[in-house]
Swiss-Prot record:
Entry EC no(s): 2.4.2.17
One BP term from GO: L-histidine biosynthetic process
Pathway where this protein functions: Amino-acid biosynthesis; L-histidine biosynthesis; L-histidine from 5-phospho-alpha-D-ribose 1-diphosphate: step 1/9
Enzyme class, spelled out: transferase
PROSITE patterns in alphabetical order: ATP_P_PHORIBOSYLTR
Family designation: Belongs to the ATP phosphoribosyltransferase family.
UniProt-annotated location(s): Cytoplasm
Descriptive protein name: ATP phosphoribosyltransferase
Annotated gene: his1
Single GO molecular function: ATP binding
Function of the protein: Catalyzes the condensation of ATP and 5-phosphoribose 1-diphosphate to form N'-(5'-phosphoribosyl)-ATP (PR-ATP). Has a crucial role in the pathway because the rate of histidine biosynthesis seems to be controlled primarily by regulation of HisG enzymatic activity.
GO CC, one annotated term: cytosol
Transmembrane segments: none
């Protein structure tokens, strides 16, 4: 099948082709009923139930493809968007739509644990290696100006920023850097490389983005997909808690489970009793159940939410 000839009139949706964001992106697509089969030898997959083509790209390239209108939607990290904004400038027409609540990490300045560097001021004039050349250059430009204004370093000193596309954390051990700036999720790779963080440049997570240059014909489908993804993300953050309680205790338990908007209260056949159904933040559900039990709620059930619409 000639894929190029099948892309006309389809919404193009860019997804990271591999790496730390890929599996979570696939889950979002499945949860949004975007059905596809990917040929591992191809970077384009046609969606079976919607006029959409998925384009699998390196996460670092997605902001450029979306921001220049080559694709219409995309998922990438906020770090990659910030880097692209500095690299491309005003030509990047991209809008951040939904924080997808995964891929959270920090872009951090890291130095050897065994060394004597404890602050970024000490790195002015030193060698820095990173995959985020523009972000790091902007960051250290501010550090330099501050250090020079305070008389900590000579005015002619300039920090050396070098780009590498991968294995950033090995740069100090190989003797080509005094510090690195890289993404830190769990910190295991950083510690295994004998590094420690001394400053955070930015925090980042995966986001859904769209081009500002989409045609009006695609807008209805764009809004459908955006709404689906937003609803799926909300569903992953909440569970539904159901319980029975006597009306005399209702004011107290409703403060425990106020719901996302408001709880649903249904009168039971047993006099004086009601059933309550309320959305609760998933990570807080154990504590909520404990409090309900301590305040005379009974028959407490927790139900998962597969999907929702905002």
């Amino acid at each position: 099948m000639d894929l190029v000839n099948h892309l006309e009139d389809r919404l193009l949706f860019a997804v990271p082709k591999k790496g730390r964001l890929y599996e979570s992106c696939v889950n979002v697509l499945k949860g949004s009923d975007i059905k596809f089969r990917r040929n591992p030898r191809l970077d384009i997959a046609l969606v079976q139930n919607l006029p959409i083509a998925l384009v699998f790209l390196p996460a670092a390239d997605i902001p450029r493809f979306v921001g220049t209108g080559r694709v219409h939607l995309g998922i990438t990290g906020q770090d990659q968007i910030a880097e692209a904004r500095l690299r491309i400038g005003d030509k990047l027409k991209i809008e951040e739509l939904v924080d997808l609540q995964f891929g959270g990490c920090k872009l951090q300045v890291q130095v050897p644990e065994s060394g004597d560097i404890t602050s970024v001021d000490q790195l002015v004039g030193r060698r820095i290696v990173t995959s985020f050349e523009y972000l790091v250059a902007e960051y250290f430009d501010k550090v330099e100006k501050k250090a020079k204004s305070e008389g900590k370093v000579d005015s002619g000193i300039k920090t050396e920023i070098s780009f590498v596309s991968g294995s950033v954390e090995a740069s100090c051990a190989l003797g080509i850097a005094d510090a690195v700036v890289d993404l830190v999720e769990s910190g295991e790779t950083m510690r295994a490389s004998g590094l420690k963080p001394i400053e955070t440049v930015m925090s980042t997570s995966a986001v859904l983005v769209r081009s500002s240059n989409c045609s009006s014909e695609l807008e209805p489908l764009l809004q459908t997909i955006i709404t689906r993804i937003r609803g799926y993300i909300i569903a992953q953050q909440y569970v539904l808690v159901n319980y029975n309680v006597n009306r005399e205790h209702l004011p107290v338990v409703l403060k425990i489970t106020p719901g996302k908007r408001a709880p649903t209260i249904t009168t039971l056949d047993e006099p004086g009793w009601v059933a309550v159904s309320s959305m609760v933040v998933k990570k807080e559900v154990a504590q909520v159940m404990d409090k309900l039990s301590q305040n005379h709620a009974h028959d407490i059930l927790v139900l998962s939410i597969d999907n929702s619409r905002p």
